[in-house]
Amino acid sequence: SPMVHCYVSQSDRGELVIGGGADTHPSYGQRGNLPTTEAVLNAVVELFPSFSRMKLMRQWGGIVDIAPDASPIISKTPVTGFYISAGWGTGGYKAIPAGGETLAHTIAHDQPHPLVEPFSLDRFAKGRLVDEGAAAGVAH
């Protein structure tokens, strides 16, 4: 939900994975912190009041890489044989299967897959940004 900045998905084992929020003091730490965890859980309970009775099994934090226009970079680079797929933000968890397939095509053919042409690394220099800031439903 963009209003409460959280998401809920169910794992193959039936467990709920709850996430969202951003540390108000960004760093490269990957441990998570209690204030962020509390904010996300409060948001989830606002959406699903019955979740207030759930037990938290574990929590973690991590780094989310986000390109300046909030769109992924899937591209060959000026360095021969060096390709990049990065900047996916939180959308990468859902979209990376297609991202992997299109990157494999780019590597195999040394040309971008037609679906990812707009997401080239040189779009920043050329001023052809792909503004996807609202695509994840949350403000990064």
Q: What residues fall within each predicted segment?
A:
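Active-site substrate-recognition segment that forms the wall
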Residues: 1-80, 138-140
